[in-house]
Amino acid sequence: MGKNNKLRTLKVTAIAALTAAITTGTAFAGNLTVFSTSDVHGSVIGWNYFTAKAADVGLAKVSTLINEARGQQTKDDAMLIIDAGDILQGTPLDTYMVQNQDEWQAGDHPMFAAFRTIGYDAITCGNHEFNFGLDYLRKASAKNNNLLGANVIDKKTNKTWQGVRPYVLKTIKIDGEALKVGIIGTVTPAIPNFEAPVHYQGVHFVSQVPVIQQGIKELKKQGADIIIAATHSGVERADRDSAENQVVSIAKACPELSLLICAHNHVVIDNTKGIKAPDGTVYKDAVINGVPIVESGKDGKFVGKSQLTLHKVKGKWTVEKVTTQAISVKGVADDPVITAQVKPWHDKTLKYLQQTVGEADGAFIGAESNHQDSAIVDLINNIQREVAGTQLSAAAAFNTSQNIEKGPITLQQLSGLYIYENYLYGIEVTGAQLRKYMEHAANYYGTSPDYNYDMLQGADYTIDMSRPKGTRITKLQYQGKDVKDADKFTLAMNDYRFNGGSGYMEAMGFNENNPPKVVYDSIKELGDAGQVRSLIVDYIKKKGKITPVVDHNWQAVGLQSQK
């Protein structure tokens, strides 16, 4: 008998057996729908705070879709809702909540309040939950007892930090039959690569695979019928630290998982899209080692919908099939309940953003600022050099759609210009290390996302993209003289870079055993006021008026023959 005929016979036999079991009253069948979000980044309602326009984003639209699904449920259906992290950073609403903590009580953060109203069953920590310290995370999530972080380990107890839970065990009903679902939550252990240690003091982050394996064992002992994992990490990438994204590793090591919800990479993954691992392996239908994978982009633009078809025979539940899809919220109305709930904070944020901090006597244009020298990146770099007292500064164009128009400068414009809660560092580097830094930057020229590509201020240089990687910096001069390997410089950079983000520190040879000499630390000097965005605001307030100036200290050539 041929292979296909064998499979067809097995399938027919299985269906016949299930049908017989159902007719004799010994089996139950139904669907578990798991809605998932990830990297919502402070988007509650359908509004873009940077452009001051309505947008197809946010939990309010997600809520509408979920409510519609609830209305269509039958007794054979059940539902779970899970978020995979990066909640407390990303919009000026989040920024307002951080800067005005005296205005709200523990648990009243609008993101976590929205999660409660919508009815989320589990929420996983993302790396941005640690941007503002453990106390802030605890305050924001105080009324949510389902915040997960199994691999966030308390240094004193060597157990899961008490501000989170390793997992939850939910009991739901399908056609009156109890189904116990275990949900494990983990976060990328690479947080020390992009976060200041003071913000996670007292905890450390361990590899996800053994933690999830342990969680599976414990949940099985507690009677879990099926187990889902939600990880704030994505599919492994060749351009990132191997610890940062661990989805393929988790799926290969944990075939017991019925579903793996992932995040962090801001991409959409479902059955319609295959997954390509760094080794070139393609996983058709986004299924790895039998484990279905789903990711729902960012900002609440999509909601993941994973439907698990289950049956129960002789007391045992089995997952027969899983389909995953990412549903766009485009054109979906905001849930008025969520809108009303967040309105006081939304209105306060809008008022906050309209503050005028200075004046521009010309336009600073964001377009192409990631491809050529620009006044907008020069402004950031000059401020970083001035504050840190360094000879050089490196910065990226975080939002090429944001301009500073001629006339009054508002906080809204500056929030759109510098969208992250970064701090500022100054370090010592040699000429050889500086060249390695710039060669590493050249590898990111013309790629996405923009935040990986740094531009240098204080030195003159040329990038020849026609040359092989590692040899593209054909000119590197400081004050008119060629930079020599033994030269010494001071370099300003944000804390994401300083802590290893995008691999620049590794490229220069810095690591835990060979740290750089720090000459400036805005966290130590200024506390929360040391965020780069705040430094930009303070600079413009002091100047009163700024002028767009481009010094044309760098250029990229050889673009047509780029290798």
Per-segment meaning from a language model:
Residues 30-33, 37, 42-71, 112, ...:
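Catalytic centers of hydrolytic enzymes
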Residues 30-33, 74-80, 118-121, 143-147, ...:
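Loop/turn elements at helix/coil->beta-strand transitions in domains of secreted/extracellular proteins
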Residues 36-45, 79-90, 181-193, 213-238:
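Short acidic, glycine-rich surface-loop motifs adjacent to enzyme active sites
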Residues 83, 122, 139-149, 242-305:
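Conserved beta-sheet core of the metallophosphoesterase superfamily
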Residues 40-44, 87-90, 128-132, 153-156, ...:
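Solvent-exposed loop/turn segments at secondary-structure junctions
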Residues 1-28:
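Gram-negative bacterial Sec-dependent N-terminal signal peptides
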Residues 47, 56, 161-163, 167, ...:
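Binuclear metal-dependent hydrolase catalytic cores centered on His/Asp/Glu-rich metal-binding motifs
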Residues 67-157, 253:
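Core catalytic region of metal-dependent phosphoesterases/phosphodiesterases
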